[in-house]
A protein has these predicted regions:
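Acidic, glycine/proline-rich low-complexity segments that act as flexible tails and inter-domain linkers
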Residues: 1-57, 84, 110-121
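Non-catalytic, well-ordered alpha-helical scaffold segments
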Residues: 23, 58-62, 90-97
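Residues at alpha-helix boundaries and short interhelical turns
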Residues: 30, 51, 69-72, 86, ...
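Residues within well-ordered alpha-helical secondary structure of globular protein domains
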Residues: 42, 64-66, 98-101
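Amphipathic, charged-and-aliphatic alpha-helical interface segments
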Residues: 58-72
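C-terminal binding/interaction regions
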Residues: 87-121
Length: 121
């Protein structure tokens, strides 16, 4: 099985490179749950980078999933990731609209909030 050498700094570097900053919820894990932080980095690395889909489509898919869960905060995170991976605003909007058949029109409002929050930055 693959071996991964992650320490706290490598984990922080990962999030700094993805977000451009260290989110508060990551900071909570750094000192109090370093093994959970390592696992979270490995899960993200596999799901976002080491799969058959390109990063733009992974981020768009995660916009859909998070909109279906009414999660505007994480729609924002992944909409920004999709932008960084080359997605157009129309593709991001369409990815959130794809949640409607699963979660209903109510998924549009938090999804739209997440999209617009990222545009404001």
């Amino acid at each position: 099985s693959p071996q991964f050498d992650l320490d706290k700094q490598a984990c922080l570097d990962y999030f700094e490179s993805y977000f451009g900053f260290i989110p508060d919820y990551i900071g909570l894990m750094v000192d109090d749950a370093p093994r959970a932080l390592e696992g979270y980095v490995l899960m993200r690395e596999w799901s976002l980078a080491e799969n058959l889909l390109d990063s733009k489509h992974v981020e768009l898919l995660l916009c859909t999933v998070n909109a279906a869960e009414f999660g505007s905060r994480f729609v924002n995170v992944h909409a920004n990731g999709a932008r960084n991976a080359g997605a157009t605003e129309a593709e991001i909007v369409e990815s959130v609209l794809c949640a409607i058949p699963v979660s209903g029109v109510a998924s549009w409002l938090p999804g739209a909030d997440g999209i617009m929050e990222g545009r404001a930055k």
